[in-house]
Amino acid sequence: MIQDLIILGNGPSRYECNYHCETWGVNGGYAFAKKLDKLFMTDGPDVMVEDISPECLEKLATYGCTLVLASRFSEVTPYYEGVGIKIEVYPIEAVLKKFNTKFFSNTICYMLANALLDTEITLDTPSGLPRVTSGYNRIFFYGIDMMTTTSYQQEKGGVEYWMGIAKGMGVEVINTKSSATGKTYNGRMYGWWGQDNEGEGVLYAPWEIIKVGKKEIPIEEEWAKSGEDWIKVPYGTGVK
């Protein structure tokens, strides 16, 4: 069966998500998501147990959400199963065998790899380009904004690497307009069609003007680099 998938991150554009198909969330996404089919968590087991309130656990159980954990977190499995949460161990060995790479810079990379693991393709097409025959043929990104002067600059390349693997398999990755993922600093192709240095060094989408669709986003904080230091900076438009 060919189907769509949403990978829901925790960035500002998460408010655009319409949950129109199977939805996978990451780490603290359980706190705001309207539905989740899977929740991938790679934080330490102490954080995973202490930070999830009974109310959130009840919500995940109501969704029928499966919690996907690394095998090294097996010690917390009884805790979640005891409150009715289904547990799935991340198939790391199968992923490493199929893709022959260890380039995973954050949880989103693991999520993309997991989706592509279950996707089959054919090259027997008129164009010779790959076509999906089963699994996910369209992956929608929401909340995977990865603004390039924040701590995400250390992770962004990994996500884009897996986006490239997806494209090479004929899988379409559909991102939000306000995301910096898969884009140059100014949204232009280098060296073509009037490309110049105008705006060089300017953040792709400045914090103070970020809006997602027609919705304002709450004021939150993100790590950003200032000189040699990392500082927390606010973003959002202040909706209550």
Segments predicted by a language model, with ranges:
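Metal-ion/cofactor- or nucleotide/acyl-coenzyme-handling active-site neighborhoods
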Residues: M1-K240
